[in-house]
Amino acid sequence: MSKHKNQRTARTLEKTWDTLNHLIVISSCLYRLNLKSIAQIALSVLAMIISTSLIIAAIIFIISANHKVTLTTVTVQTIKNHTEKNISTYLTQVPPERVNSSKQPTTTSPIHTNSATISPNTKSETHHTTAQTKGRITTSTQTNKPSTKSRSKNPPKKPKDDYHFEVFNFVPCSICGNNQLCKSICKTIPSNKPKKKPTIKPTNKPTTKTTNKRDPKTPAKMPKKEIITNPAKKPTLKTTERDTSISQSTVLDTITPKYTIQQQSLHSTTSENTPSSTQIPTASEPSTLNPN
């Protein structure tokens, strides 16, 4: 059926390609005849046909791909069913004894004894032998099984509070009681309680006094004396004799004009009061009067 569908799709694609070629030839002829409007219509029709053909081809491709996917899934399922059937038939055909012998190479037949005919000493011996055989079987099975768990470098940290709820791979000795065989197999449960660290008290060490000893070669350094500077005193002005004479002369110069002015005023007043020298004759000069 799939082959027929592929042939049909191939034929439809060929037909569409032929029609497209014919339309291209017709549009070129119309352009040569200067019939632009008709050529434009033909080109638009051609574009529509191309788009529809592409859409159809995509749909066909998707359908064929889905059909292939469904075929592959069906084949895988059939293979799985076939293998499961083969395994189940093989297991039914092979007896369980062979399977057990392959898994447990060192098996021993159990010892059956009548309890009425055997004394208690023999009972204890038979119990001991059965326990030994069971122990051997368990050890052989444990060694033959491969370890599937991946060993991690950092094991998971156990909580600190779970001291009594741990699952152990060995028998605890508290269950055994007086049974010596159980005591030989059992192991004591390790106590995971944190041990108390011994408290170390700090010892008081004697304090050593350190004295600053000076070497005899190095001279002792004298402490520097601080220079005390007195506040600057104002210099006293020393007056020389020349300076004093100059100052006195300046004072006299300032005083004399006033004194001279006073003398002149007094002289003028006295001259007015006294008669003139021409009017008053002196005793030495003789009086020369003209007789009229």
Swiss-Prot record:
<dbReference type="InterPro" id="IPR000925">
    <property type="entry name" value="G_prot"/>
</dbReference>
<keyword id="KW-0964">Secreted</keyword>
<feature type="glycosylation site" description="O-linked (GalNAc...) serine; by host">
    <location>
        <position position="284"/>
    </location>
</feature>
<feature type="disulfide bond">
    <location>
        <begin position="176"/>
        <end position="182"/>
    </location>
</feature>
<feature type="glycosylation site" description="O-linked (GalNAc...) serine; by host">
    <location>
        <position position="276"/>
    </location>
</feature>
<feature type="glycosylation site" description="O-linked (GalNAc...) threonine; by host">
    <location>
        <position position="254"/>
    </location>
</feature>
<feature type="glycosylation site" description="O-linked (GlcNAc...) serine; by host">
    <location>
        <position position="271"/>
    </location>
</feature>
<keyword id="KW-1015">Disulfide bond</keyword>
<dbReference type="GO" id="GO:0005576">
    <property type="term" value="C:extracellular region"/>
</dbReference>
<feature type="compositionally biased region" description="Polar residues">
    <location>
        <begin position="245"/>
        <end position="292"/>
    </location>
</feature>
<feature type="topological domain" description="Cytoplasmic">
    <location>
        <begin position="1"/>
        <end position="37"/>
    </location>
</feature>
<dbReference type="GO" id="GO:0019062">
    <property type="term" value="P:virion attachment to host cell"/>
</dbReference>
<feature type="region of interest" description="Binding to host heparan sulfate">
    <location>
        <begin position="187"/>
        <end position="198"/>
    </location>
</feature>
<feature type="glycosylation site" description="O-linked (GalNAc...) threonine; by host">
    <location>
        <position position="203"/>
    </location>
</feature>
<keyword id="KW-1161">Viral attachment to host cell</keyword>
<feature type="glycosylation site" description="O-linked (GalNAc...) threonine; by host">
    <location>
        <position position="141"/>
    </location>
</feature>
<keyword id="KW-1032">Host cell membrane</keyword>
<keyword id="KW-0812">Transmembrane</keyword>
<feature type="compositionally biased region" description="Low complexity">
    <location>
        <begin position="200"/>
        <end position="210"/>
    </location>
</feature>
<dbReference type="GO" id="GO:0016020">
    <property type="term" value="C:membrane"/>
</dbReference>
<feature type="site" description="Cleavage">
    <location>
        <begin position="65"/>
        <end position="66"/>
    </location>
</feature>
<keyword id="KW-1133">Transmembrane helix</keyword>
<feature type="region of interest" description="Disordered">
    <location>
        <begin position="92"/>
        <end position="161"/>
    </location>
</feature>
<feature type="glycosylation site" description="N-linked (GlcNAc...) asparagine; by host">
    <location>
        <position position="100"/>
    </location>
</feature>
<keyword id="KW-1043">Host membrane</keyword>
<comment type="similarity">
    <text>Belongs to the pneumoviruses glycoprotein G family.</text>
</comment>
<dbReference type="GO" id="GO:0055036">
    <property type="term" value="C:virion membrane"/>
</dbReference>
<feature type="glycosylation site" description="O-linked (GalNAc...) threonine; by host">
    <location>
        <position position="236"/>
    </location>
</feature>
<feature type="compositionally biased region" description="Basic and acidic residues">
    <location>
        <begin position="212"/>
        <end position="227"/>
    </location>
</feature>
<protein>
    <recommendedName>
        <fullName>Major surface glycoprotein G</fullName>
    </recommendedName>
</protein>
<feature type="glycosylation site" description="O-linked (GalNAc...) threonine; by host">
    <location>
        <position position="138"/>
    </location>
</feature>
<feature type="disulfide bond">
    <location>
        <begin position="173"/>
        <end position="186"/>
    </location>
</feature>
<dbReference type="GO" id="GO:0020002">
    <property type="term" value="C:host cell plasma membrane"/>
</dbReference>
<keyword id="KW-0899">Viral immunoevasion</keyword>
<keyword id="KW-0325">Glycoprotein</keyword>
<feature type="glycosylation site" description="O-linked (GalNAc...) threonine; by host">
    <location>
        <position position="199"/>
    </location>
</feature>
<feature type="compositionally biased region" description="Basic residues">
    <location>
        <begin position="148"/>
        <end position="157"/>
    </location>
</feature>
<feature type="glycosylation site" description="N-linked (GlcNAc...) asparagine; by host">
    <location>
        <position position="81"/>
    </location>
</feature>
<feature type="topological domain" description="Extracellular">
    <location>
        <begin position="67"/>
        <end position="292"/>
    </location>
</feature>
<keyword id="KW-0945">Host-virus interaction</keyword>
<keyword id="KW-0946">Virion</keyword>
<dbReference type="GO" id="GO:0046718">
    <property type="term" value="P:symbiont entry into host cell"/>
</dbReference>
